């Protein structure tokens, strides 16, 4: 996203709140949100600051050594040559300001957007300002998708929905000759390449007890051969190349055989019910004009699974935001690992992916949801029944 757009949207957000500005800081890659905002710049070796006031022009504070690295941004730039001139200039920038936002989360509550070190926090506070978390500014200014970004996600989502079905058919076609988990993962990655999609660190293809590990990664050494009677979980994610392309991320489950065992069906039904309860709560909130916070949706899904008797086996958050990274910087649907009070606002996308992981097998169902101005829009194919894999596809 162009820096001018980020600045304009950040100022739009801050003018409606009691915020004097947003102060971004980085040293040697400590704060990736700084670089998400200004764009990639290589070989910056000294501390750098970006001040975005609620009103007025932004200002960079960078080292004399690094000045040419930032020249293309066209932002007013102040240079420092040593520690004293850096702190003096920073004090001047913050003079008369009251409450400012930084990448800080009280008690580390939201690690995803807690990026400044304690010493820097102390330094800025010593200049007479009150520091509040920038999490909501980040979400509003950097995480809402434009039409091009949504289009890229929809393409990835469509291909993911197609390729996961192809993978299940490929397993069926390969049962007689034998196929391992990692070989199914290779098949999926090859299909990504054929469709012009990027290959990252996945997918997860997990059989039976391997599916009890939410992030199982198949390798030639740990993979098992898939056979009749097995339970198969596939979690796959990808996007188009390019800085403006957004991820899709889905998880499906299948059984190799004609009749799904009762226990597997029971757990599957609990997961599907949990997912649908969270989606229904999101849709209801929108119809009623209530903007939900991330933690609230997690509670809805978790309560459903607790009621089904499997609360002890759902030990991760309900979902995460999507963006240029598969786990992005907008709200997570989480009351478990954190307590995410950010709002689920139009323009962002999230996953709904409850899971139950008992020792013998695990079940997770993951869909993607884009929050449009007209309400939640499910962008991926929705699994309703266990896929049955049969020999010969």
Where are these regions (language model features)?
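Active-site neighborhoods and metal-handling regions in enzymes and metal-associated proteins
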Residues: 1-393
């Amino acid at each position: 996203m162009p820096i001018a757009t980020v600045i304009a949207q950040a100022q739009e957000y801050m003018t409606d709140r009691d915020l004097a500005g947003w102060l971004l800081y980085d040293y040697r890659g400590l704060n990736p949100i700084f670089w998400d905002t200004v764009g990639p710049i290589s070989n910056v070796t000294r501390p750098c600051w970006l001040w975005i006031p609620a009103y007025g022009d932004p200002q960079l504070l960078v080292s004399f050594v690094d000045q040419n690295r930032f020249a293309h941004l066209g932002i007013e730039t102040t240079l420092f040559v040593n520690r004293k001139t850096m702190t003096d200039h920073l004090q001047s920038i913050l003079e008369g300001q009251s409450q400012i936002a930084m990448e800080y989360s009280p008690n580390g509550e939201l690690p995803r957007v807690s990026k400044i070190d304690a010493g820097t926090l102390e330094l800025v506070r010593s200049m007479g300002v009150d520091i509040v978390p920038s999490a909501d500014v980040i979400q509003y200014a950097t995480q809402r998708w434009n039409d091009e970004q949504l289009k890229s996600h929809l393409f990835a989502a469509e291909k993911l929905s197609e390729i996961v079905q192809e993978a299940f058919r490929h397993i069926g076609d390969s049962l007689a000759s034998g196929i391992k988990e990692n070989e199914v993962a290779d098949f999926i990655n090859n299909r990504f390449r054929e469709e012009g999609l990027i290959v990252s660190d996945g997918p997860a293809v997990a059989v039976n007890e391997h599916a009890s590990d939410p992030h199982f990664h198949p390798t030639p050494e740990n993979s098992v051969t898939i056979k009749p009677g097995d339970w198969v979980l596939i979690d796959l994610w990808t996007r188009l190349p390019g800085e403006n392309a957004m991820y899709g991320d889905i998880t499906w489950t299948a059984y190799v055989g004609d009749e799904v065992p009762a226990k597997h069906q029971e757990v599957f039904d609990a997961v599907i019910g949990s997912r649908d309860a969270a989606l229904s709560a999101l849709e209801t909130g929108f119809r009623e004009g209530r903007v939900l916070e991330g933690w609230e949706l997690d509670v809805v899904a978790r309560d459903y699974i607790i009621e089904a008797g499997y609360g002890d086996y759902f030990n991760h958050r309900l979902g995460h935001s999507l963006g240029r990274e598969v786990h992005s910087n907008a709200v997570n649907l989480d009351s478990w690992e954190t307590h995410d009070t950010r709002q689920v606002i139009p323009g962002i996308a999230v996953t709904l992916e409850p899971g139950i992981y008992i020792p013998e097998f695990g079940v997770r169902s993951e869909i993607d949801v884009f929050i449009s101005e007209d309400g939640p829009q499910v962008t991926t194919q929705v699994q309703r029944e266990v896929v049955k894999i049969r020999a010969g596809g």
